[in-house]
């Protein structure tokens, strides 16, 4: 056995919860900036509104529980949950949806089970699923990316649509591409086209696609990937879950694409469309709701990746990370039970 020799002092520094959350939030910023660049001010408005609601709900619940409000707010967990919800929903969704989703995430999913460290499910993804199931039309109404949009909303127009003021502003005018066609997300467009009998190659000729990836979404995912790599460098997360998610999705989509390239999206499109990189580095890596052992984390991540591919190709929703993460959260105790590290000094038999 080889032993690594290092000079003193042998001092390690423990990261506090607030520090970890701060690092995650900072690493989210590149993706948020790029997302705002392609989809307008609405994303930033949703994030700020979600933060306001999350902090208010956190303080109210702490007050009811006779807990330290300042300590709870300063751990930044509520703010991180709010940001994840804000970037996940369409930028021009009505204000009451982000309020409802954020309040549900903080009050019900997080605190009903005991607060930080005790929740069974990822709060942001549970809130997303609640909104998606309850309001499917609003949750799947994305505007066209700025590079191919016929009209891009200004800050004032975004506020008017989100808060439903100003009768002259219409959502549909911001969903039109430069070809005059109403646009959806790349995954939604491809799924609709395949159901109508078009091939993948024929679908990729539309303006929403740029080669084998979606316009705008490739750069959004690339920005979240960059932030995720920095997060790994800072040791705020471990590599196992992210690697498992990306490998699981890549292997499953590669098999599907090799078997039927005319009816399946390429692995590159799966990896750089939708919420892939956001989920792989910032959502699935939630230590509270994930598996605990190193091997268990890889299995946990791979399960998410495979579930995403199955739901994207066979399910009713074009993107599937919220459902995949929640299903994997359910499986985390099962994974921990059967994938336990061997105790030092004990045999495996």
Swiss-Prot record:
InterPro entries associated with the record: NqrB/RnfD, RnfD_bac
The protein's name: Ion-translocating oxidoreductase complex subunit D
EC primary class: translocase
Cofactor(s) demanded: FMN
One Gene Ontology cellular component annotation held by this UniProt entry: plasma membrane
Organism from which the protein derives: Shewanella baltica (strain OS223)
Alphabetical keyword list: Cell inner membrane, Cell membrane, Electron transport, Flavoprotein, FMN, Membrane, Phosphoprotein, Translocase, Transmembrane, Transmembrane helix, Transport
Residues passing through the membrane, by range: 20-42, 77-99, 124-144, 212-232, 239-259, 265-285, 291-311, 315-335
UniProt family annotation: Belongs to the NqrB/RnfD family.
Residues the record lists as FMN phosphoryl threonine modifications: 185
Record's subcellular location: Cell inner membrane
Reported function: Part of a membrane-bound complex that couples electron transfer with translocation of ions across the membrane.
Origin organism lineage: Bacteria, Pseudomonadati, Pseudomonadota, Gammaproteobacteria, Alteromonadales
Enzyme Commission code: 7.-.-.-
Membrane topology: Multi-pass membrane protein
Disulphide linkage map: none
